[in-house]
UniProtKB/Swiss-Prot annotation:
It comes from Escherichia coli O7:K1 (strain IAI39 / ExPEC). GO terms for biological process: methylation. It catalyses: trans-aconitate + S-adenosyl-L-methionine = (E)-3-(methoxycarbonyl)pent-2-enedioate + S-adenosyl-L-homocysteine. Catalyzes the S-adenosylmethionine monomethyl esterification of trans-aconitate. One of its GO terms (cellular component) is cytoplasm. This is Trans-aconitate 2-methyltransferase.
Amino acid sequence: MSDWNPSLYLHFAAERSRPAMELLARVPLENIEYVADLGCGPGNSTALLHQRWPAARITGIDSSPAMIAEARSALPDCQFVEADIRNWQPEQALDLIFANASLQWLPDHYELFPHLVSLLNSHGVLAVQMPDNWLEPTHVLMREVAWEQNYPDRGREPLAGVHAYYDILSEAGCEVDIWRTTYYHQMPSHQAIIDWVTATGLRPWLQDLTESEQQHFLTRYHQMLEEQYPLQENGEILLAFPRLFIVARRTE
C-alpha cells in the first residue's frame, strides 16, 4: 500500500464529489485566471473547477504518482504537478486555492493556513473541506484495534476546531465563512464501510503491516464496526460522515 489507489478511491466517486460541489458553490468568484487544486487526487475536484472556469489556468497538486497519472489522463487541458502541498510554490499569486479533503493529512495548521493565504492575490479565496470524523466510530475503532494488536498509532491529528480556524484565518487578513455538515451515506454492508475507509483513513494503519497482519486487523475492525453500526430496517447502514467547510477571502 505504498501509493494511493485511484480506482478504489473513485469507487465512491459520487459521495466524495458531493462535498466538493457544495464547497465550490460557496466560492464568491466569477472571472478568475489562476487556480490551484491542492490534493487533487484523480482529478474529480479539478474537473468541477474546470467546468466552472474553463478559461482559467488550473493546476492540480498531489504527492501520489498514481493519482497524478489518473488526473492527467482524465483532464488533458489542466496542468498537474506531483509535489508536497507544503513545499509547492505557484509561479504567480492565485485567485483561488481549492483543497477538498486533503489538508487534514497535513500537520501544523496554525502555520499551514496562513502560508496558503499568502499565496493568494488581493481578494483571492482559500476554499477548504476536511473530514471531521476523528471522533466517529470509524476512526475511533482504528485506534482501538491498533492498540489491541500492539501496533503504533498512525492516524492523523484531529482538526484544530471551528473557533481555531476562524481565528487563524481572520488574523491572516481574511473574511471567513465556516460551517459543518454531517452526511449520512447509505452503505449496503459493514464491508462497504471498510472499502470506503481503506481508500483513505485506514491507509496509514495498514501500509506497514504484512498481509497476514492486515487481515488480522481488518477482521477485528469488521467485528467492531458491526457492534457500532446497526442495520436499518431495510438491511442498509447509515454512515455518519461530518465535514468541515471553510471559505476564506483575503480583504487586502
